[in-house]
Amino acid sequence: MRFEFDAAKSAANKAKHGIDFVEAQTLWLDPDRIELPARPTNEPRFLLVGQITQALWTATVTYRHEETIRLISVRRARENEKAEYVSGR
């Protein structure tokens, strides 16, 4: 599995949400993480909800090629996403 992202967007995400895209990659270490469809755009996007330390985070991602995950944004999980995470465990 390989990650790609825009470095400037990662820095902006850190300033806005308190997490950059390098830190966000640890979401994939959560064995209970879930994936939900994101709102349709011009490319298929997904929401990955998982835990980092004691907080739930949501990453918006798209898949490129076979093993590449492109991080688009990361933020704290919303209440409905938290409920989905808990029910999926």
Could you say what each language-model-derived stretch is?
Residues M1-R89:
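Ribonuclease/tRNase effector modules and their secretory precursors
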